[in-house]
Structure formats: structure tokens, C-alpha cells
From Swiss-Prot:
Organism: Thermofilum pendens (strain DSM 2475 / Hrk 5)
Gene transcribed to yield this protein: pcn
Subunit structure: Homotrimer. The subunits circularize to form a toroid; DNA passes through its center. Replication factor C (RFC) is required to load the toroid on the DNA.
Protein's name in the database: DNA polymerase sliding clamp
Transmembrane segments: none
GO terms under biological process: leading strand elongation; regulation of DNA replication
One GO MF term attached to the UniProt entry: DNA polymerase processivity factor activity
Functional description taken from the UniProt entry: Sliding clamp subunit that acts as a moving platform for DNA processing. Responsible for tethering the catalytic subunit of DNA polymerase and other proteins to DNA during high-speed replication.
Length: 247
């Protein structure tokens, strides 16, 4: 039997919208420990890694590890119908995913499970030299600013400051984040680093995922992938790994 109930359908809406920025179909794995997903976008530029421990659910019944393969757009459309005080439950039965919204009325949606080809993705082993935590909406706003002049941004870290830089024939934009200004919560620079990333993916991810957590964790190194972590209240995590853009 597989069934899990989450008390806030809106938070699930934010999670699903965030996942849908890089994948159309998702191969969730439900185990007694919790719900997880690891997937690559079709262009193999970005990877998403989601884990929600079983204790975050109001009800969680999973006897054995079970794959739940579904079209994210189907789930997203259901969640757009959710009311502010709705609970949401997911159940797997007879080859179908059953989603129930419970509030003033109980509304049930049923979708066929799908087959998703592909191998299990290993956890990347990377050596980051910069780790920082900052306000997620501040990072989102800086990306919006950078998109005015460029299709890519450079992240640069030195001492106790982090910069987001954008440059093109249209102009230049520079955003500096630090603990003293309140935009950074913490920063650890083992070695000065800089790397460039495409704004398109960054903006898609952050503009959806920032609603999940006020704080965004960033880790990177020179010309290495960027890891972005959004903590889900109670112990869950939503992580993205974005390949660098080589200049």
C-alpha cells in the first residue's frame, strides 16, 4: 500500500512547480524513509534532487519501496485547483495515481501511472570551495536585474562577499551580497572562485523554488557546477545542480 497525506496543498504546489522547471515527467520513489526524486533535464544541464522525510507527512503508509511515475503537468493542474486550507493526499492503486484534495469538499483525481525509461542517477561527488546562505528572494531579484543585459551571469566569491555579475553589449550589472548588508546569512570561502551559468535555467528554478524557503544555500567552485539548496520546513530538501557555462 502506498498513501501519503500532506497538510498544506499550497506547499506541494510550489514543490511541483519547481520540479516542472526542468522535467516534464517524474519518477518519484516512495520508501518507508520518505519520498525522493532525482532527475536530469533533457539537455543534461540541470539535475534536481528532492527528499521529503516520512515524518513531514500527516499520514505516511509505504510498506516497501515503490516507484511512482507521473506527468508533472497533470499534478500541477490539480494543485492549481487547491484551496488555501486544502489537504492533499496521494495514493497508488491499480496502476493509477489518485490525488485527493480535502477541504470543504473532497475532490478526487485519477491519472494513469506512466513508464519512464532511464537508469538511477548516482549522487555527484564534487569539491566546492565556496558555501553561502542568502535570502532567496534577494537572489531572485538579482537574477531579474541581470537578465536585462545578459543571458548568463557570473558568480564570484572572495573573502566574505559574493557577487553576481552580468555583462554584454547592452551594459553591465553588478550585485554584491554580504553579511553586513543582510543579504548573506553566512559565507565560507576556502578559495576564491568564479563561474558562469545560464540565466534561463537559474531564473526558472529560483523564481519558483524561492517560495519554498526564505533561505537559499549556494555552493560552487571555479568553473564547476552550482548547487542550490532550498530547505523544506521540518527536514526536507530540494536541491538543484546546474552545469557551468564555459566562456
Amino acid at each position: 500500500m502506498v498513501k501519503f497525506v500532506f497538510p498544506d496543498a499550497r506547499e506541494w504546489k510550489y514543490i511541483i512547480e519547481s520540479l516542472a522547471t526542468i522535467v516534464d515527467e517524474a519518477n518519484f520513489v516512495a520508501s518507508p524513509e520518505g519520498l525522493k526524486l532525482r532527475a536530469l533535464d533533457p539537455g543534461r544541464i540541470a539535475m534536481v534532487d528532492l527528499f521529503i522525510p516520512s515524518n513531514l507527512f500527516e499520514e505516511y503508509s509505504v510498506d516497501q519501496e515503490t516507484k511512482i511515475s507521473a506527468v508533472l503537468d497533470d499534478i500541477d493542474k490539480v494543485l492549481k485547483r487547491a484551496k488555501s486550507d486544502d489537504k492533499i493526499s496521494f495514493e497508488v492503486s491499480q496502476g493509477r495515481l489518485i490525488i485527493t484534495l480535502s477541504g470543504r469538499a473532497e475532490r478526487r483525481f485519477k491519472f494513469p501511472l506512466i513508464d519512464i525509461a532511464g537508469q538511477e542517477l548516482p549522487s555527484p561527488k564534487l569539491n566546492f570551495t565556496v558555501a553561502a546562505k542568502m535570502l532567496s528572494d534577494t537572489f531572485r531579484d538579482a537574477l531579474k536585474d541581470a537578465s536585462l543585459v545578459s543571458e548568463s551571469v557570473k558568480l564570484k566569491a572572495e573573502d566574505e562577499s559574493l557577487w553576481l555579475l552580468a555583462r554584454s553589449d547592452k551594459g553591465e550589472i553588478e550585485s554584491r551580497f554580504s553579511i553586513e548588508t543582510g543579504s548573506l546569512v553566512e559565507i565560507d570561502v576556502k578559495e576564491a572562485a568564479e563561474a558562469s551559468y545560464g540565466i534561463d535555467f537559474l531564473d526558472k528554478i529560483v523564481s519558483k523554488a524561492y517560495r519554498i524557503s526564505d533561505i537559499l544555500g549556494l555552493r560552487f567552485a571555479t568553473n564547476m557546477p552550482l548547487e542550490m539548496t532550498f530547505d523544506i520546513a521540518g527536514g526536507g530538501t530540494l536541491k538543484y545542480l546546474l552545469a557551468p557555462r564555459m566562456e
